[in-house]
């Protein structure tokens, strides 16, 4: 049976403020990209999410970001490479401790938001993130965009790279994501998204916003936990894949 990983961004609340339905998403996905406190998340909330993930057998990944709570990590920061390296090391280490206390472990790293998009093409920041992962644990896979500078830097350091596609985001013809500031960047119809994901998994391709066919390498599919209707979208994707004989399983 064919298999694919489903991942979602979780643990992104802060204090009394909650974002998304982490418990419901943990019943659907196979991997949880857990915030590390720099773009979202507080220690108590992160411990709660990691405990719930451990109970459900969901893999935990460190979702590292720029130090940007106010902007939710969605703003580019021109940070020096050595500072970014230290920030990423710190975030992975913090979540490793929390996951360990919860009876789980961090088994991969995924950059978040603006950092994710920046290191597709930014050599210095891509190298800093890859080197930070290597310094913490060279056995940790990194989740990201195929063909990115980040993947080149990670592979150069012997890190395993895991290519992901986005269930609910529109793609540009060059393979990058359409900016959230643009109309149609975030998709919302659960049934249409589910069919789109099945096509991605079956054919290794997706239709870009200009109608052209875009080849994709897909080992994991991200469903954003903070999108409107996230639980309904994730459920539709899971159910459609299962109906087509595709097993939902973690990559690590």
Curated annotation (Swiss-Prot):
The keyword DNA repair does not apply. InterPro entries: Glyco_hydro/deAcase_b/a-brl (IPR011330), LamB/YcsF/PxpA-like (IPR005501). Gene3D superfamilies: Glycoside hydrolase/deacetylase. One of its GO terms (biological process) is carbohydrate metabolic process. GO terms for molecular function: 5-oxoprolinase (ATP-hydrolyzing) activity; ATP binding. Keywords: ATP-binding, Hydrolase, Nucleotide-binding. It is an enzyme of class 3 (hydrolase). It catalyses: 5-oxo-L-proline + ATP + 2 H2O = L-glutamate + ADP + phosphate + H(+). It holds the Pfam family LamB_YcsF. Its EC number is 3.5.2.9. Forms a complex composed of PxpA, PxpB and PxpC. Belongs to the LamB/PxpA family. Catalyzes the cleavage of 5-oxoproline to form L-glutamate coupled to the hydrolysis of ATP to ADP and inorganic phosphate. This is 5-oxoprolinase subunit A. It comes from Mycolicibacterium paratuberculosis (strain ATCC BAA-968 / K-10). The gene is pxpA.
